[in-house]
């Protein structure tokens, strides 16, 4: 056999080994709009059949509500899948963690019946820490902006990611290492922030004493999650990733600067967990049957009228994290086409269809136009351009009957089915599930 043939076979063997090294795939649940689409409920439904559920980015600025066995759980840092006692929950390296909030969240949910968390929660040693002074800075920066505030949650997420990007952040693993080194780094990062924000007051010694206690509390949960996840994939374990926030809040692809400080699109899954692209299986886009957003920023289909009020009231549109009323508007197809382009949805879960039950007609945005009437063939890249567009709507007939008790797609009113099919045809993405209520039992399997 010639050397070239041998080399070719050698290459093919190695190449085949690389392409077949994982026995399972990672399925991903991502918000397709501005958040609050109902991702937690979808994750809760899917988590009953998986081995591992992961958070990959964001912090306790996210808010997910899950109803399990009649009990309502609110999660901010913990993955929603933690209610399933058979699966392991992972907080990945891309997440920023405020330890006081994490342990408060654990206590509150344990009081509601969450059990045995110590055996099934894993935290990455590479995840960065959010400190109280990050939160103070967040509030101060928002206050300084006055009427031009970004509407952040003031949870310190942006300042913590800033510390990470400027390479003076502190990771969980450093808290668990030599505490003298941690103390030095902590004093250094405090000094930097005091220099930039002289009005913040940090009792360094008190904070160090507090974090010495947190080191002992968090130690049992901390692992190299990258190694853990790759081993799991090689062994055929099923993994589900729960994206926090949503595509239109992504630091790169969202309505910048009215965005969060992390990548909440598909790229953040890879960098936030240390996974290669070939591990990704299903990408499930969660779409609310109408559109909402919390805080400031452009919102082309917003309804500042009776329709907006009705959606807000019927949908109980109040932020889990901020307690602010959510702004409400019609479903936006150009926005969804854009986020589908970025994320590559393989299927969609449409949520809160029941909120539209009382409407005689329903509008859906189908195109954006420039002021001169010319249709846009792309999603605007600046808020100035987005704020200057006109929206073209399709008007669909409503169904004016309750869908809350329906559990079979074919039993939905014909016009409700048509609404779902319209979304499918516009996006060329199949709708796999439709939600018509709060609990996991209210999710209809379409196919």
UniProtKB/Swiss-Prot annotation:
GO biological process, one term: IMP metabolic process
Signal peptide range in chain numbering: none
Catalytic activity: IMP + L-aspartate + GTP = N(6)-(1,2-dicarboxyethyl)-AMP + GDP + phosphate + 2 H(+)
Positions annotated to bind IMP: 36-39, 61-64, 153, 167, 245, 260, 324
An example molecular function term from Gene Ontology annotations: adenylosuccinate synthase activity
TM regions (residue ranges): none
SUPFAM superfamilies named in the record: P-loop containing nucleoside triphosphate hydrolases
Binding site for substrate: 320-326
UniProt keywords, alphabetically: Cytoplasm, GTP-binding, Ligase, Magnesium, Metal-binding, Nucleotide-binding, Purine biosynthesis
Free-text comment on the cofactor: Binds 1 Mg(2+) ion per subunit.
Pfam (any one): Adenylsucc_synt
Principal place of residence: cytoplasm
Residues at which Mg(2+) binds: 36, 63
Listed InterPro entries: Adenylosuccin_syn_GTP-bd, Adenylosuccin_syn_Lys_AS, Adenylosuccinate_synth_dom1, Adenylosuccinate_synth_dom2, Adenylosuccinate_synth_dom3, Adenylosuccinate_synthetase, P-loop_NTPase
Pathway: Purine metabolism; AMP biosynthesis via de novo pathway; AMP from IMP: step 1/2
Binding-site positions, GTP: 35-41, 63-65, 326, 352-354, 435-437
Essential cofactor(s): Mg(2+)
Active site residues per record: 36 (proton acceptor), 64 (proton donor)
Gene Ontology CC: cytoplasm
Enzyme Commission number(s) from the entry: 6.3.4.4
Family: Belongs to the adenylosuccinate synthetase family.
Role played: Plays an important role in the de novo pathway and in the salvage pathway of purine nucleotide biosynthesis. Catalyzes the first committed step in the biosynthesis of AMP from IMP.
Subunit structure: Homodimer.
UniProt-recorded name of the protein: Adenylosuccinate synthetase
Lineage of origin: Eukaryota, Metazoa, Ecdysozoa, Arthropoda, Hexapoda
